[in-house]
């Protein structure tokens, strides 16, 4: 698993700095690797010649021809390190999003990825397009969050 190339690292870090307001100095302390069009943050680079089905670390982003998509998991871990592009939802809005619905979002953020937040907790990645918010959160995590909402 190769370390992330300098141009790719610059592009991934630019997403988190420019879109989400994460401090570039923090991102510079992380070790980044790329495998199968995925960008991972790891505590140590794997030894040369060692391959794993999955890298030991956190998947931070996916590389698509259309651009870079941050993962819900990494946004959750960044939490309060993000200062921009956050959609603070209430419980009924969160339920709608988790059920796969889009909701009206008049907040004025530019189209693109946002961190979905309920109170102080970042719950995952959202997409804002033409004043509508959706949540491409993984199915397992959606079910987990819906279950928690029903229990409260």
Task: Write out the residue ranges for each language-model feature.
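Polybasic, low-complexity RNA-engagement segments
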Residues: 1-152
């Amino acid at each position: 698993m190769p370390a992330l190339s300098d141009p790719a690292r610059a592009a991934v870090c630019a997403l988190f700095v420019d879109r989400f307001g994460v401090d570039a100095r923090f991102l510079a302390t992380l070790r980044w690797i790329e495998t199968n069009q995925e960008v991972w943050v790891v505590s140590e680079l794997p030894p040369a010649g060692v391959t794993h089905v999955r890298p030991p670390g956190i998947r931070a982003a996916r590389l698509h021809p259309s651009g870079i998509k941050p993962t819900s998991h990494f946004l959750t871990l960044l939490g309060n390190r993000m200062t921009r592009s956050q959609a603070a939802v209430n419980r009924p809005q969160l339920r709608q999003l988790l059920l796969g619905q889009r909701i009206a979002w008049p907040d004025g953020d530019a189209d693109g990825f946002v961190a979905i937040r309920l109170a102080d907790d970042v719950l995952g990645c959202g997409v804002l397009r033409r004043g509508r918010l959706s949540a491409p959160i993984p199915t397992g995590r959606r079910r987990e969050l819906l279950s928690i909402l029903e229990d409260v």
